[in-house]
């Protein structure tokens, strides 16, 4: 079986484009580790042109996969002070499936070829490590963390990766807000878009996110029921007051199809989020059904959006709408 020394030796066969040294010797390759048959490495590509970064990425993957016993190679590229945008996924109320929606939007965007990462900003109730099956503790350099790669193409950082499972986080607001900043200000490499899974409510974490990290827009998740919509409206008002655009509303848990007879029922009501969006003059991004398959896949750490079946389609449609909002096509000139 290979060990870390085998990986380091392989990396040193790839020359640093700037110094000519091996990648491990030059310090360009770091956080080298072996998990079973999977090799992980972080490569600093600061100072390299995009074509050179791509070439280096391919070379690193090739030498790692050539090590006997290595079946998979995960390479995370990092660079200094990248330009990236942040989109907040929020709700006024807990239990509406916001984290599941955030995870699947990120995965759907990654499948579209977007360089996307996810920050689990729900400091007190982190769930993204479970949704992505990514429980590894993140590495750090100079007290700055590196996101944990996932097999779904979306690197993530979460407080759930830093504490023992089941342990409560008894922090006051300023400490939680500081933790959020550490997650956002991590070594995100060439990630162009960060999906921020916010905790429910309108407290210190949300205010820090708005004041310090300034998302380009926010998506509000709600169930159709009136109680959830009342709290969602409070979250919308917070973003309105901060002059942060609302990209749109999503209605989650919208309709339940009986697995035996196929009859559709609406345990949480029907159309409430769409009606609220119309009343507020906001875009409605779509409905996600209350489906057993989505729940079981999410609990197993397999985001449904990674597939192409019916359960994935609502997430793909929402991701396309978000991508169009972020990258609008130029209007034709007549």
What do the PLM-derived regions correspond to, one by one?
Residues 191, 214-235:
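Conserved Switch II/interswitch segment of TRAFAC-class P-loop GTPases
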Residues 1-30, 67:
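N-proximal, solvent-exposed amphipathic alpha-helical segments enriched in charged/polar residues
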């Amino acid at each position: 079986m290979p060990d870390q020394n085998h990986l380091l030796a392989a990396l040193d066969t790839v020359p640093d484009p700037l110094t000519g040294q091996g990648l491990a010797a030059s310090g360009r390759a770091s956080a080298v580790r072996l998990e079973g048959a999977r090799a992980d490495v972080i490569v600093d590509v600061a100072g390299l042109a995009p074509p050179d970064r791509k070439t280096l990425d391919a070379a690193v993957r090739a030498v790692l996969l050539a090590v006997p016993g290595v079946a998979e190679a995960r390479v995370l590229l990092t660079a200094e002070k990248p330009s990236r945008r942040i989109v907040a996924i929020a709700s006024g109320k807990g239990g509406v499936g916001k984290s599941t929606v955030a995870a699947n939007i990120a995965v759907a965007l990654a499948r579209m070829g977007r360089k996307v990462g996810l920050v689990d900003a729900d400091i007190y109730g982190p769930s993204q490590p479970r949704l992505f099956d990514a429980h590894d503790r993140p590495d750090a350099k100079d007290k700055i963390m590196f996101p944990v790669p996932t097999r779904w193409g979306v690197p993530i950082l979460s407080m759930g990766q830093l504490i023992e499972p089941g342990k409560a986080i008894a922090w006051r607001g300023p400490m939680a807000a500081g933790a959020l900043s550490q997650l956002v200000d991590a070594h995100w490499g060439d990630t162009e878009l960060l999906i921020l899974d916010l905790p429910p409510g309108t407290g210190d974490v949300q205010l820090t996110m708005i004041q310090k990290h300034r998302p380009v827009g926010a998506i509000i998740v709600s169930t159709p029921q009136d109680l959830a919509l009342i709290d969602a409206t409070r979250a919308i008002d917070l973003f309105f007051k901060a002059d942060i655009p609302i990209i749109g509303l999503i209605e989650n848990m919208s309709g339940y199809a009986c697995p035996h007879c196929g009859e559709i029922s609406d345990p949480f009501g029907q159309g409430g989020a769409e009606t609220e969006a119309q009343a507020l003059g906001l875009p409605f991004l779509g409905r996600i059904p209350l489906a057993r398959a989505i729940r079981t896949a999410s609990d197993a750490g397999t985001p449904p959006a990674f597939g192409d079946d019916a359960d994935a389609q609502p997430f793909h449609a929402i991701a396309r709408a978000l991508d169009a909002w972020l990258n609008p096509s130029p209007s034709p000139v007549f």
